[in-house]
Amino acid sequence: PLLRLIHDPPQRLYVRGDPEVLREPQLAVVGSRKASAAAVRAAETLCGQAVASGLHICSGLALGIDAAAHRGALRAGGKSVAVMATGIDEIYPARHRSLAAELARSGCLVTEFAPGTPPLRHHFPRRNRIISGLSLGVLVVEAALPSGSLITAGTAVEQGREVFALPWSMLHPGGAGCLRLIRDGAKMVLDIEDVLEELGPMYRLQQDLFEAQQGPGDAVAAAASPILDLLGFEAASPDELVRATGLPAAQVMAELSALELEGRVTRCSGGYTRT
């Protein structure tokens, strides 16, 4: 449900594994392909703790942090989603074929690219919007400057998702990107509780989105909403609604998504208007 609400959702998805996993709460975990040993351990530990708390892990099947995130989830008995920049039959990198097979058994592989599509450079940034779009938030474990992980973080912000980053030392070779994200407003993560605390509102609202798609129910958007009360025929931006309601940004974005799904609000260039 969350992916459908981004401004440029994929027209179709090819899935290998269990597609129902895509409907369930996920945390995106990304970072450097040339990850440090400390970052690999951090990714595996945090992802294991996340799945123990009921989240699935979403990442990109790349070397480094992506692989550590997937493995951390699997070792903890959880499920993980790998979003690919190739066709569903083209595993990249090739050394991750066994990892991909394991992911497909408990979670799934997913891509918007047709079977047979090779790993083209310009497909990776497009893939990143799906990683963030499927997820409640994005955790950047390690990132230098520049880094593709920062593209994913930027896309997450545009989609109204929470962004998290680990606070490395300024002397850590792969930590500059994370420090910049924290400077720019990302939530600093010292343990998994920092993530879970922020994702609570988004987690609950995703369940309401799912229930709304199943048919009539008690979705949050159907109840009296302070956001709906504030919207008229002039567009209001999410930032304006955050200030006016005093609600967390994640909750505002989640409620707007639920209201949009129900047809009660319309997204436009200036923000949102009441339908």
Protein language model annotation of sequence segments:
Residues 1-275:
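Glycine-biased, small-residue-rich flexible motifs in mid-sequence functional cores and linkers
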